[in-house]
Amino acid sequence: MAFKQLFAAISLALSLSAANAAAVIEKRATCSNGKTVGDASCCAWFDVLDDIQQNLFHGGQCGAEAHESIRLVFHDSIAISPAMEAQGKFGGGGADGSIMIFDDIETAFHPNIGLDEIVKLQKPFVQKHGVTPGAFIAFAGAVALSNCPGAPQMNFFTGRAPATQPAPDGLVPEPFHTVDQIINRVNDAGEFDELELVWMLSAHSVAAVNDVDPTVQGLPFDSTPGIFDSQFFVETQLRGTAFPGSGGNQGEVESPLPGEIRIQSDHTIARDSRTACEWQSFVNNQSKLVDDFQFIFLALTQLGQDPNAMTDCSDVIPQSKPIPGNLPFSFFPAGKTIKDVEQACAETPFPTLTTLPGPETSVQRIPPPPGA
């Protein structure tokens, strides 16, 4: 059974289980901290949680270390190719932690440039707590997202055996790849379609770039990089006017706001006829954003794994805070209006949004992790 079909079956089973929860007495285990979990083996992850919140995420912040931890999940997980396996070649193990186990090899791959810093920061926690790299990467990514206001309640499953060999190069999409290349890549990895590709890119709502422009680091993709919201989907549809740094870098196109970066792949996917309407659908629709990203994140973290053999430890992941009440879910940054939108969806009009008051928005850089 293909991964996507298996994952759908697991999701259905979980939904049916939740629907009947009132009629079933759920067995819960009580941990030493007084919290309860569905499986006693999950209790150990509370110690990991406390440690990384304090010593990796600086008290639970949605900062550079959180952003890079989320990026690491995708780069570890997407490195799997059933098409290569069908040709008799090793196609990678997906969400197996190979990028940390074989970091000297995989972080040297071009799309993984810069990830060596977060791998270096995370490795001591793996060694200290005796967990597998694949499980830790998924856990740290889920916790990182929970630190970002507006994020969904993240799921986390354990049960990943350590990788035995590095993933092959060429499996992680690049900013300069075409839409066709990226759609084909995610379809090969997990039978994901073009709509689910857009869901994956929701992670760019809480992200920054350190390595596209060598002259400047910590450039966010939108004006609210510390909040999991739909501003990324608004601002990628605004007309680009300038580069935040040197310009002319491979995979970079003009962005609409000073201090904000736009990569070529986001620009083209936002305007492609196959993806433009799904892209626009997230504007001012926080509930859709949350639901779709919750699904796709779990699917990514189970690539290459058997979900039936994994243990659900989602109880350990904190719940994120709501989006600050002084901000609408979506808006035009100060100085921008509907006239700046390059709408590509032919099916529905662009949502009506307010423009924030004040001078033109300038986006602040995010300090990169130590050593970056």
Curated annotation (Swiss-Prot):
Name of the gene: LIPB
Cofactor: how bound: Binds 1 heme b (iron(II)-protoporphyrin IX) group per subunit. Binds 2 calcium ions per subunit.
Region (Disordered): 350-372
Protein name: Ligninase B
Binding site residues for heme b: 204
Positions of the record's site feature: Transition state stabilizer: 71
Cofactor(s) listed: heme b; Ca(2+)
The protein's Enzyme Commission number: 1.11.1.14
Comp. bias regions, Low complexity: 350-361
Residues where Ca(2+) 2 binds: 205, 222, 224, 227, 229
Keyword terms, alphabetized: Calcium, Cleavage on pair of basic residues, Disulfide bond, Glycoprotein, Heme, Hydrogen peroxide, Iron, Lignin degradation, Metal-binding, Oxidoreductase, Peroxidase, Signal, Zymogen
Cysteine pairings via disulfide bonds: 31-43, 42-313, 62-148, 277-345
Propeptide residue intervals: 22-28
Pfam families: peroxidase, Peroxidase_ext
Function in brief: Depolymerization of lignin. Catalyzes the C(alpha)-C(beta) cleavage of the propyl side chains of lignin.
UniProt pathway annotation: Secondary metabolite metabolism; lignin degradation
Catalytic activity from the UniProt record: 1-(3,4-dimethoxyphenyl)-2-(2-methoxyphenoxy)propane-1,3-diol + H2O2 = 3,4-dimethoxybenzaldehyde + guaiacol + glycolaldehyde + H2O; 2 (3,4-dimethoxyphenyl)methanol + H2O2 = 2 (3,4-dimethoxyphenyl)methanol radical + 2 H2O
